[in-house]
Every structure is written in C-alpha cells, then in structure tokens.
Design a protein with these regions (language model features):
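Structured surface patches comprising rigid loops and adjacent beta-strands/short helices at the edges
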Residues: 80-87, 186-193
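Short, flexible, surface-exposed loop segments at domain boundaries
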Residues: 2-76, 88-182, 194-249
Length: 249
C-alpha cells in the first residue's frame, strides 16, 4: 500500500489541500487552511519554528513575493539567493513562477525559504525528481496551529515515527528520540500516502514510518506513509504480524 518517499517538509503537503495528487472528494483536517505555524523540535530537543502561508501569487519580483490568501489577507516575503522553488518533487527557478498561480510559502520568521505546491495554469512541471530537505525535515514532535479561510482555527499535535503496533482502534509509534507515543483512531482518521492517495488505517503495518496529526490523542491524519526498512538493511528481523495486532496501553 505504501510508497517509499523522502521525508521533506511534508507538513506542507498536508496544508496544501488543493494538491493535484489528493483525492478532491476527501477533505482532510487542513483543507481550507491558509496559514499555519509549527512549533516543533528535533530528536535532540532543538526548537524548529516554521510558518506556512498559502494563496494566489499577486505580486512577484526578484526580491519579493506576495500572496493573497483565501481569507483576503496579503502576505509578502523577501526572496533571497537561498529561496528554493519546489513542485511535485522537483526543483525549479523563480522565473518559472508567475502571478495568478497558487502556492505555499514556507518561512521561518523572515524571507521565503521554500515556494512549493504550486497549482494553476502554467504551474512548473516536467523537471527531474530530486531529494530535498525543507525547514521542518528534522522535526519529530510539536504542535501545528492552523488558521482557515473562514476565520476558524484548530491546533494539532504532531509526531513522526515508525509504527510499533496497530489494531483495535489503537496505534503506537516510536520516534527518533526513542519516545513511544500512543494514539486512538476511528473511522474518520484519514490516511494519505506519499503521493496523496487515500489509504486506510487497516493497511498500516508495523515498521512503516509516517507523520501523525492528532487532537486529544485521536488521530486525525496519517501522512506520507513510507515502507519499513528491510530486515537486510536494518540488520533486525521484521516484526511479526502478531505485533501489529497487539493491544496498546
């Protein structure tokens, strides 16, 4: 079910509900989000603060980009030599952008770090796929506060790790900091694979890695599922099927 992916700043995938890879008939918890702030940390506890804004490009130059979000707010970011343009797994140039396209700008309290998830007529495409680590690539835990175009807001707990057990409405992961985190899930829990395709909690397997967005311990979204490492690569025997069905506390 799952596809091997490179974990980049994948929170942005979740924020970009308009992605052409996503099933438009299924709305995830970030559908309609225009702004989000991640208060995150890496496995050593170092803080990572990331902001995402999504909207239509209404002004663009070599030195700045302005988005008009769906809540009618305009946000402007400086563009530097370090600003990266990414779309559908490939890197592009600033000259590949134009006003009228919809994009997500990733920032960290300053200039645009990444411009990505670009949609609309003439959106850049066709370049070779390449790996890329965005600002939140090393984040394994934290919170994401999302603002929606209608003025409402929601907060989500964020964790990233590999599944240790899943079944009977409960799922436990192990993060890179060796901390175990347990969740509950229900029929409304959304699973999206790396390409945005809809999956099912029933298809999740022990050893698979993903990002987990929850509220009050209840999983709302499992994102960018990727395969468990092979026993040969890890030097460890593969978890047994019974482990996946083991109840968790």
């Amino acid at each position: 079910m799952s596809k091997r992916i490179t974990l980049i700043c994948a929170l942005v995938f979740a924020l970009a509900a308009g992605s052409a890879f996503a099933d438009a008939t299924v709305k995830g918890p970030f559908a309609g989000a225009v702004h989000a702030v991640g208060s995150l940390s890496d496995k050593s506890g170092n803080a990572i603060s990331v902001t995402w804004d999504r909207g239509k490009i209404t002004s663009l130059s070599d030195s700045s980009i302005t988005l008009t979000r769906r809540d009618k707010q305009q946000v402007t970011f400086a563009i530097t030599a370090d600003t990266v343009v990414r779309n559908d797994g490939a890197t592009y140039h600033l000259s590949d952008l134009k006003t009228g396209l919809v994009a997500t700008v990733v920032s960290q309290g300053g200039p645009a770090e990444v411009i990505r998830n670009i949609r609309g007529d003439g959106a850049p495409s066709g370049a070779d796929q390449s790996e890329f680590d965005g600002p939140a690539a090393k984040a394994i835990t934290g919170t994401v506060a999302a603002l929606y175009y209608d003025g409402s807001s929601q907060n989500f707990d964020y964790n990233r790790g590999r599944i240790q057990s899943v079944g009977n409405g409960q799922l436990t992961i192990m993060r890179a900091d060796k901390q175990s985190v347990s969740f509950t899930y229900d029929s409304n829990t959304l699973v999206r694979e790396g390409e945005g395709n809809i999956g099912s909690v029933d298809d999740l397997k022990v050893g698979e890695g993903a990002m987990f967005f929850s509220q009050g311990g209840l999983l709302k979204l499992v994102r960018c599922v990727h395969d468990a490492p092979s026993p040969q690569a890890s030097g460890q025997p593969a978890p047994t099927a019974s482990a996946a069905a083991a109840p968790t506390k």
